[in-house]
């Protein structure tokens, strides 16, 4: 890769996983999920990896609450899970609310998680508040993905992978 007049060499930081998804940088570590490998990984800048097995959950989107706990979108069970550093427990069961498996997720500075369903049409985005209140905040989406909250915290932006916008 060349940027300007400098030549850069890209070097892999980590490998050995199946389908990396939902990368987040938190407390000096890169966190990411491996949906097909059913785990969440961390890796530091030296390439040292650790693994949190999540058999039966197919984790996708990740996000951190202000207290440092990790939220995990469980693709197949359609649950949002919370990892506090020791245990993994369900925070919200969205199976009766979302039309398809869960996908991307982003968490704002107030600890509210915005989770997309991977429906090719009729998808929704659900907000899970810290008190576990669940609210559908957007609907009729074509595979919502790639969510980000603007730095001022006022706008949630989302790509529609199938809708191509």
Could you say what each language-model-derived stretch is?
Residues 1-165:
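Sequence-structural signature of mature extracellular/luminal beta-sheet repeat domains
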């Amino acid at each position: 890769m060349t940027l300007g007049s400098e030549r850069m060499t890209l070097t892999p930081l980590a490998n050995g996983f199946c389908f990396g998804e939902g990368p987040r940088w938190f407390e000096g570590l890169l966190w990411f999920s491996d949906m097909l490998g059913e785990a969440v990984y961390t890796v530091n800048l030296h390439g040292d990896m650790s693994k949190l097995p999540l058999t039966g959950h197919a984790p996708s989107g990740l996000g951190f609450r202000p207290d440092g706990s990790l939220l995990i979108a469980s693709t197949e069970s359609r649950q949002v899970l919370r990892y506090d550093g020791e245990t993994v427990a369900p925070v919200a069961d969205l199976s009766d609310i979302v039309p398809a498996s869960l996908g991307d997720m982003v968490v704002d500075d107030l600890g509210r998680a915005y989770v997309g369903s991977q429906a090719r049409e009729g998808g929704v985005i659900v907000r899970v508040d810290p008190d576990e209140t669940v609210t559908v905040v957007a609907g009729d989406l074509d595979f919502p993905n790639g969510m980000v909250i603007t730095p001022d915290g006022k706008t949630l932006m989302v790509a529609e992978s199938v809708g191509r916008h």
